[in-house]
Amino acid sequence: MNRTDRLRLWYERAASRWEETLPIGNGSLGAMIWGGAPCEVLGLNEESLWSGWQRDRNNPGARAHLEEVRRLIREERYGEAEAVAEAHMLGEYGESYLPLGSLHLAFKHGPATDYMRELDLEQATARVAYTADGATYEREYLASFPARAILVRLTCSQPRMALTLSFESPLSCRTRADEVGLIIEGQCPEHVDPPYIPDRPEAVIQGERGRRFSARVRVLSGDGTVRARDGRLSVDGASRLVLAVSAVREPELPAGASYETLREAHIRDYRALFDRVELWLGPQKAMPTDRRLAVLREGGEDPGLYALYFQYGRYLLIASSRPGGLPANL
């Protein structure tokens, strides 16, 4: 097998829960790809979308109890030291990381056959392919650090691809549509309780001090007819469509740049990091990744899966943290 065959996660069905989705990211903007047919969902996150606003949440009275806690520790009275610290030295809870929302692609075709989805770790691309109504549909997704955007290429072997694009979010936002794409503008709540504390009446406070944000879904190229209506885009009679998703930061999309050019720049940038390490623990098994995991749980041997798991961890770190952005938050 060549290296590309070794470094991919692939499946013969769409994700049915979040843990099965395919993640892509450029350090600041990420997507979890469900791979549904005919209804695709991209769960979107942006690194700076938190509840709250900039303020000092340290406990000003903590210093007064510091010496007492140190004394109790020196006396090996650790339980008492912990109780004093928890009662008098802790600050307020931190705020909550929030999802940007979901991009929905609803295709108008019949049941899918010959289904496959994959995450290529060598090129940092995700792909979904299947057949429906006698035509072959393919989708490719990548999160480009140079372009500061998520790129989506949709193709159909016949010029009859029809779909509706829409955006949904749990945040307070408004979506507008024109023939160029979708425009999303919103505001994060000024407070959201962390999920690990008990529910209380004011667990979520929208207020006016939360972070404001914007996002765009642009139609970069394609054929067919694109119409905007009621905050959605409708596409009919297409064989090819390229989208760019951006949030908070303006994307770097040179005028006239083709998808292929943007894709090559993405792969070149990503591989400068990913290609620093190789690991070979044996040949790969020619079966979907979820079946390989099931065999391993039943006591089977699959050394190649451990190597894939190692490289998947490296892929996730590259996807979630890049220069100029925030550290990975998980």
Give a label for each model feature.
Residues 1-330:
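Aromatic-residue-lined binding/catalytic grooves and analogous aromatic/hydrophobic interfacial grooves
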